[in-house]
């Protein structure tokens, strides 16, 4: 089975790439966790599709499996839900050498990871992402969190998984909106780090949208390699890793202001990337031609490029609560050229100029 390794010294772990191979998961997971006692967390959308396949494979490998199914969507990513799951873990008899398996998209991965990070001060954790967004973003890098009503991912930890399993066959069950949400993050990697990935997406956009397996596998693996490289250089987001938040400053503000209901995460990031590029253009960091090229690709995918019914002053206030802002300064990830990004301090009035 194809895999790459995220290099974090003693916390290094593999990301496996497969197609319709859930039957092999039990034997793979067994290599990476300390005991056979495991707790699967999934949601009501994913449960009927993949739970039995995973459960069967784990039981063939003699795992003692317990599980919990939660409502799908961002509204489950709360302290209340985390507490409920932690109490279930205790009721099921999980010990310090037990493991948590996240079977689902980004929300499931985040809250399951948070449970694993906090239960008995941290237990083993396995990621099985079932959305394109989770496969290329939240399942890689060890950031786990829950939301507060006023902000996204405010309560969290860094807790690296023992392994990640990416099965591209699951993408065939996603609707187009979910595929596009993941594609937004993949485009982001090309913009901030490796412009050859951006060019590959430009040249193969229609095949990618048609879910051609070889094209999808290429951009997913490339995205994981890019994120893995950045994480290995800056695991705790002290400096470099912050560039992964490109598009997220305004994106998170839009999500919070709309109650996490109007836009899925990738859509908000797409809008955020457009505005981050407008800001870089206004500040003279990139030229018009480069801006138009990025805007055109995002538009061609069918992702949104603008928000509706929000006041720019409210967006700025939400941005001030962003984790990237420190000492009352607004920190923004901005482009400095093709495949180059950095965190820059930006004045409030500069942001207001580009917002509508």
Swiss-Prot record:
EC number(s) reported in the record: 4.2.3.4
Group of enzyme by EC: lyase
Cofactors that this protein relies on: Co(2+); Zn(2+); NAD(+)
InterPro entries: Dehydroquinate_synthase, DHQ_synth_AroB, DHQ_synth_fam, DHQS/DOIS_N, DHQS_C
A cellular component annotation (GO) from this entry: cytoplasm
Name of this protein: 3-dehydroquinate synthase
Record-stated family: Belongs to the sugar phosphate cyclases superfamily. Dehydroquinate synthase family.
Superkingdom per UniProt: Bacteria
Localization (cell): Cytoplasm
Pathway: Metabolic intermediate biosynthesis; chorismate biosynthesis; chorismate from D-erythrose 4-phosphate and phosphoenolpyruvate: step 2/7
Catalysed reaction equations from the record: 7-phospho-2-dehydro-3-deoxy-D-arabino-heptonate = 3-dehydroquinate + phosphate
UniProtKB keywords: Amino-acid biosynthesis, Aromatic amino acid biosynthesis, Cobalt, Cytoplasm, Lyase, Metal-binding, NAD, Nucleotide-binding, Zinc
